[in-house]
């Protein structure tokens, strides 16, 4: 991928995550982290409403099917590893209920939110 294309993809991802964050705020969630990065992985968005914590992967694609297949098992493991690190930093860790969700950003559509996109395998 050329530098120009990489930059374009990066900014497209930023815009998509902003749309997804807006969508979650409309549903009553508070965004507590964006692009949480660790050595083992990255989480696009972390949202919270009460004791429910959403670990959200965001993908912008032409179709929902394309967006869903863009997340493979290896991506899930990296997201889980990053989630473990973030959760360990929380004081109320034992009281939190964690859910792994997915938001697809599709052209000319509202964000498509899939709850429980995958389950933790640990």
From Swiss-Prot:
Instruction: Report the SS bond pairs.
Output: none
Q: State the superkingdom.
A: Bacteria
Q: InterPro entries attached here?
A: Restrct_endonuc-II-like, tRNA_endonuc-like_dom_sf, UPF0102_YraN-like
One GO molecular function term?
nucleic acid binding
One short Pfam name that applies is UPF0102
Protein family (similarity comment): Belongs to the UPF0102 family.
Q: Which HAMAP family match?
A: UPF0102 (MF_00048)
Q: What is this protein called?
A: UPF0102 protein BARBAKC583_1042
Species annotation: Bartonella bacilliformis (strain ATCC 35685 / KC583 / Herrer 020/F12,63)
